[in-house]
Regions:
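Short, intrinsically disordered, low-complexity terminal segments
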Residues: 5-6, 20-23
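Extracellular/lumenal and peripheral-membrane lipid-interaction modules
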Residues: 24-319
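Bacterial N-terminal signal peptides
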Residues: 10-18
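Bacterial N-terminal signal peptides that target proteins for export
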Residues: 1-9
Length: 319
């Protein structure tokens, strides 16, 4: 092994402890694991290949779902993203995909084949009523932030089979509205002529915690504002696009970083940082790493959409 490579390996090992040398956290710690502070700027985040959101800015914490366990990048169910402040945009197409795949995908779901488009500051939602012989429907409405932090879609115009209806309840009927308002349909409820969406429940893992304080239609995107904008964050001096993590413990692959000081930096600042947690390892391998005098890591990361060979399936162990 040449001297340069040997020196690099030694530096790398200073930051990490191999998993084989770690006791089982559930057996060794009787105290709660410290939350990991997180900040993001201008990130295109993939929940799945088609379900993508644009994180304009974000400050919050990664909370282990098991208080005595670690945040594990290879297990999206191991943590929740608690938002202190964020601005996140999701396209109409991506939201329709979320509703079709995550909310109304179960056998007997009342709605199917949903599509969403924007017109001026309105949303147009189309679909079929499964329990009414797949009758097509269309509703046009406005968005607002509910007092409890959910999103309210107020239906102004409703049609079924191209015929105007009095309102959403007239379209659905009492029985269908009651079916939507059960625990079978996660994150969606009906209140009179309004459809209420809960971002905490409708999105795939990793799940978020946070209250929507404002929402608007901007072009083909639905822009959600969570919390109150912060004056600064711990990574504010970092230029460009990034995902930053500080404090707490993080495990990824065979390595664990204690008292984390990790920033993943976009190698191409010309567009948003395209990041897919299911394939973070492929993105890391395509980049390079630098260490800081304070034992932190700065990982210059390739955009997912710029990988030469895009993975076709998730890596083993992804959940």
């Amino acid at each position: 092994m040449n001297a340069k490579l040997s020196h690099g390996v030694c530096l790398f090992l200073l930051f990490f402890v191999p998993l084989s040398g770690l006791p089982n956290p559930a057996q060794t710690s009787a105290t709660e694991t410290q939350a990991v502070q997180v900040a993001m700027k201008n990130v295109t985040y993939h929940y799945t290949e088609p379900i993508v959101v644009h994180i304009v800015r974000l400050e919050g914490e990664l909370l282990p779902t098991n208080p005595r366990a670690l945040v594990v990048f290879d297990d999206k169910s191991s943590f929740t993203l608690a938002l202190t402040s964020a601005e996140i945009a999701i396209s109409c197409n991506a939201l329709a995909q979320v509703l079709n795949e995550n909310v109304f995908s179960f056998a007997g779901a009342p709605l199917k084949d949903l599509s969403i488009e924007s017109k001026n500051d309105r949303l147009i939602v189309k679909g079929k009523l499964r329990q009414k012989m797949d009758v097509p429907f269309e509703t046009t409405g406005t968005l607002s932030a509910n007092a409890d932090g959910r999103i309210r879609l107020h239906a102004e115009h409703v049609k079924a089979a191209h015929l105007p209806m009095k309102g959403l309840l007239d379209l659905l009927g009492i029985d269908l509205a009651r079916l939507i308002n059960t625990n079978k349909v996660r994150g969606v409820t009906v209140e009179k002529d309004d459809l209420i969406l809960d971002p905490e429940q409708i999105l795939p893992p990793p799940h978020i915690q946070g209250k929507v304080t404002a929402v608007r239609v901007q072009g083909n995107d639905i822009v959600q504002v969570f919390g109150t904008p912060q004056a600064s964050n711990f990574a504010a001096k970092q230029p460009g696009n990034y995902l930053a993590f500080r404090h707490g413990d993080i495990r990824f692959g065979k390595l664990t970083m204690h008292d984390a000081d990790l920033i993943m930096i976009d190698m191409d600042r010309r567009d948003p940082f395209d990041f897919y947690l299911d394939h973070y390892q492929d993105q890391l391998v395509a980049g390079y790493t630098k260490s800081t005098p304070e034992y932190g890591l700065r990982v210059y990361t390739r955009d997912y959409n710029q990988l030469r060979s895009r993975p076709t399936t998730s890596q083993p162990g992804k959940r």
